[in-house]
Swiss-Prot record:
Gene that encodes the chain: tsf
Record PROSITE patterns: EF_TS_1 (PS01126), EF_TS_2 (PS01127)
Organism expressing this protein natively: Clostridium botulinum (strain Eklund 17B / Type B)
Tree of life domain: Bacteria
Function summary: Associates with the EF-Tu.GDP complex and induces the exchange of GDP to GTP. It remains bound to the aminoacyl-tRNA.EF-Tu.GTP complex up to the GTP hydrolysis stage on the ribosome.
Keyword entries, A-Z: Cytoplasm, Elongation factor, Protein biosynthesis
Name assigned to this protein: Elongation factor Ts
Protein biosynthesis listed as a keyword: yes
Family statement drawn from the similarity comment of this UniProt entry: Belongs to the EF-Ts family.
Lineage: Bacteria, Bacillati, Bacillota, Clostridia, Eubacteriales
Keyword Manganese in record: no
Compartments in which it is found: Cytoplasm
Involved in Mg(2+) ion dislocation from EF-Tu: region residues: 80-83
Short name of any one Pfam family annotated for the protein: EF_TS
GO molecular function: translation elongation factor activity
One GO cellular component term: cytoplasm
């Protein structure tokens, strides 16, 4: 006879459903340790079965060290917004961001083999979470920053839909440096720059843009002598759209980001330099399969 106490203990240890726990205990004649093994085996099988499903929902999470000198941003995907709001999923994503900040891993493959806790790797812990919550999940990507002189700052928008990580360098500690990092996070989240500066833009791409603008201007009947000026004007506009330092500050449309930083550098009494930034948007680039609900129900009923 399997006791309710044994079922409860097994549920607490594994997170599996009540009936699954009862079946596992029945199979193992009430041996909890063996039942844990059975559930792990079944959980792994369930996780493998789910791994083919599209995981385009989820969360972007960040973590900043106490000294504000390092930080990380991660994207953890699942299949539905329902699971993305689950407390266990959120806690896993938070823990993942913290681990990513201090890890020596440089790829997702290396990261998931890091220790999640004293008993499991990140991949093993994720597999257990997949088994408990019943959806495919993937650690999609992560980036970590660290700076000796300056700060690393992050911002999360829309409950984990968009995340930003920024590294700002300065030789002095000043509230102005923190303010720059904070405002840049907001700017990047809102304006979505693709590059830090004009120098980072691929020149082959610029030449292609110039040729497109040149042909457009000629097709509009513009005189050749002013076409080049028009092309350069459009290229400058392109820079202002895609380069962070060239963008107009979202809080003051009369001021560029570069001018804002220069003003804050005067307050700090030292140059402030933006070293790098990254912006994650949940699910970007993942093709989500839209299923017909009626067809899905019929499929599950075997019709």
């Amino acid at each position: 006879m399997i006791s309710a106490k044994s079922v409860k203990e097994l549920r607490e240890r594994t997170g599996a459903g009540m009936m699954d726990c009862k079946k596992a205990l029945t199979e193992t004649d009430g041996d909890i340790e063996k039942a844990v093994e059975v559930l792990r085996e079944k959980g792994l099988a369930a996780a493998a079965k789910k791994s083919g499903r599209v995981a385009a929902e989820g969360l972007v999470k960040t973590y900043i060290s106490e000294d504000k000198k390092s930080g990380a941003i991660v994207e953890l995907n699942c299949e539905t917004d329902f699971v993305a709001a689950n407390e266990d999923f959120i806690a896993f994503a938070d823990a993942l961001a913290k681990i990513a900040t201090s890890t020596s891993a440089t790829t997702v493959e290396e990261l998931v083999n890091e220790k999640f806790d004293s008993e499991a790797t990140i991949q093993e812990a994720l597999t257990g979470l997949i088994a408990r919550l019943g959806e495919n999940m993937t650690v999609r990507r992560f980036v970590k920053f660290a700076v000796d002189n300056g700060v690393v700052k992050s911002y999360i928008h829309g409950g984990g839909r968009i995340g930003v990580l920024v590294e700002v360098a300065c030789d002095v500690e000043s509230p102005a440096v923190e303010e720059v990092a904070k405002e840049l996070c907001m700017q990047i989240a809102a304006a979505n720059p693709l590059f830090l500066s004009k120098e980072e833009v691929d020149q082959d791409s610029i030449e292609k843009e110039k040729e497109i603008y040149r042909v457009q201007a000629l097709n509009e009947g513009k005189p050749e002598k002013i076409v080049e000026k028009m092309v350069m004007g459009r290229i400058q506009k392109y820079y202002k759209e895609v380069c962070l330092l060239e963008q107009l500050w979202v809080k003051d449309g009369d001021k560029t980001i570069t001018k804002f930083i220069d003003e804050k550098a005067k307050e700090a009494g030292s140059a402030i330099k933006v070293n790098r930034f990254v912006r994650f948007e949940r699910g970007e680039g993942i093709e989500k399969v839209e299923e017909n609900f009626a067809e899905e129900v019929a499929k599950q009923l075997g019709k």
